[in-house]
Every structure is written in structure tokens, then in C-alpha cells.
């Protein structure tokens, strides 16, 4: 399983990669392996500001549906359109082409509430 060092992680198994004032958000390799085959990603919050820890969407696998929680407060700027036709990208490349949303980070200090790769791996 992969745990990239350049990301921050939530206890709910989301990751965030910050690039300036924006960030990409997805689910971890562990989360996708636990969920199994991803069949649909639903993010109804495009254009909305969602608080840290709040639900911004859901992810549906063959066997279950799980909420997606915001790692930091941010405005949802973009949803990964490739997931409409290929939701399995979340399984195949969770930290790359399988990203779920791009956000405008509202409070970078909230990143301090998240785990680094080592701390996240220790929770599994």
C-alpha cells in the first residue's frame, strides 16, 4: 500500500495535496482497497464552501456507499470529470488520476490538524 509523504491525511481516509492556495482531495489507497470496486462518485457541492470534517459527497462501491469528508475548509472548485466515465480511476490511481475534487483552501492552519504519512499509516 502507498502512503505518499507529500500528502496530509484524515482519520476518515481522505488525503489532501496542497498546491499554493488550492488543493486536490481524494481517498487513500487503504480506503479504496477496503471499499472494493468503485462504481460511482457523487459530489453535489460544486461551488460551495464546505467546512473541515463536513461531508462533501459520497463514493459508491459494489458493496457499500461511504461519505467523503472535507480535510480542510474549502470551496469546491472542480470535480474530476474523468470519474464519470471511469470511477475505477480511484482504485487504480488513488493519489493521481483518481483525485476527486480540487478546492480553494480557506484556512491553511487547519492542515495542522491532519496526519502526515507516518502517523496515518500507524492508525491502520
Q: Which residues does each predicted region cover?
A:
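Acidic, low-complexity mobile loops and tails
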Residues: 1-58, 88, 92-124
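Short coil-to-beta-strand transition motifs
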Residues: 7-10, 67-73
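Structural motif
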Residues: 22, 73-75
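A short beta-loop-beta micro-motif enriched in histidine and acidic residues
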Residues: 37-38, 63-65
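Short, conserved catalytic or interaction motifs in soluble domains
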Residues: 61-64, 81
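Short connector loops at helix/strand junctions that flank enzyme active sites
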Residues: 63, 69-71, 95-98
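Short, charge-rich, low-complexity interaction segments located
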Residues: 76-92
